[in-house]
């Protein structure tokens, strides 16, 4: 089992309550060590926090809470979610933060996993982008060719997403790749450059499953929406009741459209791109390109007031 950690999104409500997406952290090489022997330390922006996680025998990290049963005896409850008070103790900056999970073991030594953790206000408007087939030009080849030195990216994607960000929207990235591929995938997104434009920063959400399970769902069964719908539902549930945070979605399959419609993204704000880089805006018959959307940026993605924190996406 491979090690990896997923990016995290924290949403701050007007009442000051913080809610986060799952803390998916996996130390694959430590799965044989008993969980009671392993405490995972958490550092944010290079500073140690008072919050810790505990390692299970499978290598997954959890938060542990005391839970009272009917007979008043205390039971231990495992969770991937910290409380609002715990999130506040992380002392997050608005926007992007670096989070490190550190395991110290006499057997395996010191092991570190790094991810990004974002703090956004509940007024945020989010644009979703799939990675494989949407940023890359192929679901499968897009995972391999960039690491062989070949560009396999749709033309104009970094320029378009940069303009969307400048209009005040936040971007999140989705992939059905396994958490064990997190470092490789983040490196690809972070180093992607087209005509001096890079992809705007934003959390990357992945499959918490193993590589073979993830590949089976993505490539063989072709049902990635079975992952993306609960993933996006979890993100939506971070927002106050009644808030619709998702503004638009980019994908490359009908299953992406199914997931986006399930989350109430309007039909004409769902964009599907094919392997020849032609983009269909659902509800229209004529295909265009990422460049065509860029030229209509003010019409399709009108500027929104981002005065709460104009560095929120940094």
Name every feature range the model reports, one short phrase each.
Residues 64-72, 129-138:
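Short, surface-exposed secondary-structure junctions/capping segments
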Residues 28, 173-174:
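Conserved short N-terminal element of RNA/RNP-binding modules in eukaryotic RBPs
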Residues 1-119, 312-314:
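Intrinsically disordered, serine/threonine/proline
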Residues 15, 30-32, 47-49, 56, ...:
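Conserved beta-strand elements of beta-rich interaction domains across eukaryotes
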Residues 107-110, 135, 142:
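A compositional signature for long Ser/Thr(±Pro)-rich, low-complexity
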